[in-house]
Amino acid sequence: MASENMTPQDYIGHHLNNLQLDLRTFSLVDPHNHTATFWTLNIDSMFFSVVLGLLFLAMFRSVAKKATSGVPGKFQTFIEMIIGFVHGSVKDMYHGKSKVIAPLALTVFVWVFLMNLMDLLPIDLLPYIGEHIFGLPALRVVPSADVNITLSMALGVFILIIFYSIKMKGVGGFVKELTMQPFNHWAFIPVNLILEGVSLLSKPVSLGLRLFGNMYAGELIFILIAGLLPWWSQWVLNVPWAIFHILIITLQAFIFMVLTIVYLSMASEEH
């Protein structure tokens, strides 16, 4: 679908569609004429998230192999600054003894940042290549603007919350925490279970939706600027918004990391 033949409404709708695979037939579907189901996979979001994850691993592995005790290079210094920043954040916010939290926090921060950073690419660049070179019906390049990706990451954090809660308190302690707080009486077990259950489930939901909402809104603004304004005036709004969006990209990655650390710290504490 050539963007020059679209109305502004078609242009916006086209850029909000994912490249989808029907898992029942293992064939690409036309997102304009297909309603997503449980068996529909957004393969563009999966592809870019995996590629960016591998990029993160490659960058840090390269620095680790070349690290020296002498004067570090600029890239090594930059990576060391990120590691030091994340390590300091974990040290301040996590009060447990697990050695996994710092590497996890580093992975979360850099991976989410790289996914968010895709939002700064020209809105038509990769979709144009996908359409005209590979014949793809649609392509979205910002994985964190896909609610499936953000909620999947939040689900991973939720599983870790349950794991650390049971590890530190035991199954009995975890169940007691859900049933005997905030009212420490057996008669209030149903009320406690509802209150604590909602509190527990709200953590991954809010974690995933917060990241999705902010990145989706940022992506939508770029699309609106490109779809509704003439090309010669787009730079007037695009450049200031892109500069401001750099702050949003970094802040959202930081918030996701901080909340992950805080939730796991809460799960590791005795009450």
UniProtKB/Swiss-Prot annotation:
Belongs to the ATPase A chain family. Coiled coil: none annotated. It is found in: Cell inner membrane. Key component of the proton channel; it plays a direct role in the translocation of protons across the membrane. It comes from Klebsiella pneumoniae (strain 342). The chain crosses the membrane at residues 38-58, 100-120, 146-166, 211-231, 242-262. SUPFAM superfamilies: F1F0 ATP synthase subunit A. F-type ATPases have 2 components, CF(1) - the catalytic core - and CF(0) - the membrane proton channel. CF(1) has five subunits: alpha(3), beta(3), gamma(1), delta(1), epsilon(1). CF(0) has three main subunits: a(1), b(2) and c(9-12). The alpha and beta chains form an alternating ring which encloses part of the gamma chain. CF(1) is attached to CF(0) by a central stalk formed by the gamma and epsilon chains, while a peripheral stalk is formed by the delta and b chains. GO terms for molecular function: proton-transporting ATP synthase activity, rotational mechanism. Keywords: ATP synthesis, Cell inner membrane, Cell membrane, CF(0), Hydrogen ion transport, Ion transport, Membrane, Transmembrane, Transmembrane helix, Transport. GO terms for cellular component: plasma membrane; proton-transporting ATP synthase complex. Pfam families: ATP-synt_A. It is a multi-pass membrane protein. Gene3D superfamilies: ATP synthase, F0 complex, subunit A (1.20.120.220). GO terms for biological process: proton motive force-driven plasma membrane ATP synthesis. This is ATP synthase subunit a.
